[in-house]
UniProtKB/Swiss-Prot annotation:
Pathway: Carbohydrate biosynthesis; gluconeogenesis; Carbohydrate degradation; glycolysis; D-glyceraldehyde 3-phosphate from glycerone phosphate: step 1/1. HAMAP family: TIM_B. It catalyses: D-glyceraldehyde 3-phosphate = dihydroxyacetone phosphate. GO terms for biological process: gluconeogenesis; glyceraldehyde-3-phosphate biosynthetic process; glycerol catabolic process; glycolytic process. The active site is at H98 (electrophile), E170 (proton acceptor). It is found in: Cytoplasm. Belongs to the triosephosphate isomerase family. It comes from Onion yellows phytoplasma (strain OY-M). The lineage of its organism: Bacteria, Bacillati, Mycoplasmatota, Mollicutes, Acholeplasmatales. This is Triosephosphate isomerase.
């Protein structure tokens, strides 16, 4: 099986912010300035109503994804959006299992698993969110919780699909709170996530899979976060709403990607070794 090197990911989850005009202005500005996708993959997840307009403007250096989708291709599911509908708009990425979907809309690991399998079936690229609550963290059960969450979510997912899946580690206690795991702590947890994927599949497959961090990412901490060896990028929330901040994230990632590439060639290392 052939695996691609891990490209850094800078993703922005706009949640329920931005109307059409300001969203179009953002995409028009950013798409002209973000780094080449061979260095950094840049993604924006806007509201559903913006997908049609924004997907038409996305370029090779900036892509647009949906914040959610249903697991059935069509049917009487009022208020939902199908994977086929996303594809018809030119959307190739989808965010699954965000903590706010779980908290406010009752999504479970089993629901996310069905959506993940459906996304893969329809050739969409899923970014799958996992993360623990504050109580779980305080009880020192983070690894146990995440191990079970990953087992549930990846049930039935074939190994060859892993390099087309992004995992976003977003500790629930750090979402929209201003609190953030230290970069070193986030790095440790992401190493544990990769170890679990290795246990479920293989070390080669897990090392080819990108795992990013989300949780109160900011201009102040982005550089330190991306310097962590296990972290392949970020999923930013409100911090991704400002053009300058999003471009700053992408530029930092690009600089680090270029530096890492130089080190790889000097050391003759495997480009996706953990």
């Amino acid at each position: 099986m052939n695996y691609k090197p891990r490209t850094k990911v800078i993703a922005g989850n706009w949640k329920m912010y931005k109307c059409k005009d300001e969203a179009l202005e953002f995409i028009q500005k950013v798409s002209l300035q973000v780094p080449d996708q061979t260095q950094v993959q840049t993604l924006i997840f806007p509201q559903l109503t913006l997908l049609d307009s924004l997907a038409q403007l996305q370029g090779t250096n900036l892509q647009v994804g949906a914040q959610n989708m249903f697991y059935e291709s069509e049917g009487a599911f009022t208020g939902e959006v199908s994977p086929q509908n996303l594809l018809s708009l030119g959307v190739k990425h989808v965010l699954l299992g965000h903590s706010e979907r779980r908290t406010f809309f009752g999504e479970t690991d089993q629901t996310v698993n069905l959506k993940l399998l459906s996304a893969l079936k329809h050739k969409l690229v899923p970014t799958v969110c996992v993360g623990e609550s504050l109580l779980t963290k305080e009880n020192n059960q983070t690894q146990v919780f995440l191990d079970q969450q990953l087992t549930n979510i990846f049930a039935g997912v074939p190994e060859e699909a892993l390099q087309n899946i992004i995992i976003a580690y977003e500790p629930v206690w750090a979402i929209g709170t201003g609190k953030s795991a230290t970069p070193q702590d986030a790095n440790k947890v992401i190493e544990q996530i990769r170890d679990k994927v290795t246990a479920l599949y293989s070390s080669q497959a897990s090392c080819a899979m990108r795992i990013i961090y989300g949780g109160s990412v900011s201009v102040a901490n982005i550089k330190t976060i991306l310097e962590q060896p296990a972290i392949d990028g970020i999923l930013a929330g409100k911090a991704s709403l400002q053009t300058e901040d999003f471009l700053f994230f992408a530029q930092i990632a690009s600089k680090q990607a270029l530096a890492s590439t130089k080190d790889i060639f000097q050391k003759n290392d495997c480009p996706f070794c953990c």
